[in-house]
A protein has these predicted regions:
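Flavin (FAD/FMN) cofactor-binding core of flavoprotein oxidoreductases
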Residues: 103, 235-252
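C-terminal auxiliary extensions adjacent to catalytic cores
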Residues: 253-301
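A Rossmann-like FAD-binding core segment of flavoenzymes
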Residues: 6, 11, 84-175, 230-231
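Residues at the starts of beta-strands that form the adenosine-phosphate
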Residues: 59, 92-96, 191
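Glycine-rich, N-terminal phosphate-binding loop of Rossmann-like dinucleotide-binding domains
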Residues: 15-16, 64, 144, 156-157, ...
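A conserved FAD-binding loop/helix module that cradles the flavin
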Residues: 195-238, 244
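FAD-binding core/adjacent interface of flavoenzyme oxidoreductases
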Residues: 1-77, 84-88, 153
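FAD-site-proximal beta/loop scaffold in flavoenzymes
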Residues: 23, 29-56, 148-151, 155-213
């Protein structure tokens, strides 16, 4: 640790994510020109300044990596909110969504509707694997096309945060931490519990803040039992809710419930539980803000 060694009986890690810019030619070392803005802070401020400086009639191009990545609906929400800003401030402009995936990864029908409502302002292009970028000309080289942008936002491929590899945690595909879902302990490393986006995901389990909060509760309950010499809960249940703004006021959501399956040894989505919004509306916007206040209070109490 920063101020010296700390002894522990059980260790809980939430490594988050780190990026693999080297997998895209020309990107590494150029993220001041081509921001990812996928970690809040200077990068998100940088992207905002670039958008504010973009001329009316300019092109904002965003590239989405292949799943899994942090926050499945996040890139599509960003596209909507950038379009909402440009529609008012720079209506001659264009939002180009270059998706390495074959389709929208979350709330597909709802985001498709949202993009359609923006008309010619938004163009969604699936199966757009990014080969390389030119930071001087802000050009994205796809497998079969070359895209010139005024603002180029490339979200690189991801893996578990650097501490995961440095600590020798077991990684699936050299990227995501393999865990025992009953305790969230890293496989082969008893006493080391890992949470959040860094995990190799169970089926249909998103890398979201809400899910990380749920992981923490499963781990905490398991740790209390283990300290008492008791087995962990054999059937933990976790839930997820994710709200996405499609403009300044209208919001959509997705929710899911996942229960541990003893045979498969991982959480499985509960059929019929959760679901998605019927349509974007302002009432869901109020629910989104209430959700945010509640989860902040829960996590920061």
């Amino acid at each position: 640790a920063k101020h010296g060694a700390i002894a522990w009986d059980r260790l809980v890690l939430s490594p988050g994510i780190d990026f693999l810019p080297g997998r895209i030619g020309g990107l590494e070392g150029n993220q001041e020109r081509i921001p990812h803005a996928w970690k809040a802070g200077p990068q998100t401020v940088l992207l905002r300044k670039q958008l504010e400086a973009m001329p009316d009639g300019g092109v904002f191009a965003m590239h989405i990596p292949r799943a899994p990545y942090r926050c499945p609906p996040g890139p599509y929400e960003r596209a909507c909110l950038v379009a909402n800003y440009l529609r008012d401030a720079k209506p001659k402009s264009k939002v180009l969504v270059l998706d390495a995936n074959g389709e929208i990864q979350s709330k597909k029908a709802l985001f498709t509707q949202a993009f359609e409502r923006y008309g010619a302002l938004v163009e969604y292009v699936p199966n757009s694997a990014l080969q390389s970028v030119d930071a001087d000309t802000l050009t994205a080289e796809l497998e079969f096309d070359s895209i010139k942008a005024d603002v180029l936002n490339v979200i690189p491929p991801m893996r578990a945060g650097n501490i995961a590899a440095a600590a020798g945690l077991p990684l699936i595909n050299d990227a995501w931490v393999d865990v025992d879902w009953l305790t969230l302990e890293a496989k082969g490393m008893p006493g080391v519990h890992v949470l959040g986006d860094a995990l190799f995901p169970a089926p249909a389990m998103p890398k979201s803040g809400h899910m990380a909060n749920q992981h923490a509760k499963v781990a905490a309950a398991a740790i209390l039992n283990l300290f008492e010499g008791l087995p962990p809960n054999p059937t933990p249940v976790v839930m997820n809710t994710c709200y996405s703004f499609v403009d300044a006021k209208n919001v959509i959501h997705v929710a899911s419930v996942h229960q541990f399956d003893a045979e498969k040894k991982q959480p499985i989505p509960v059929s019929g539980a959760g679901g998605v919004s019927s349509m974007a509306n302002e009432l869901e916007g109020k629910s989104a803000l209430a959700w945010a206040r509640n989860i902040w209070a829960d996590m920061l109490a």
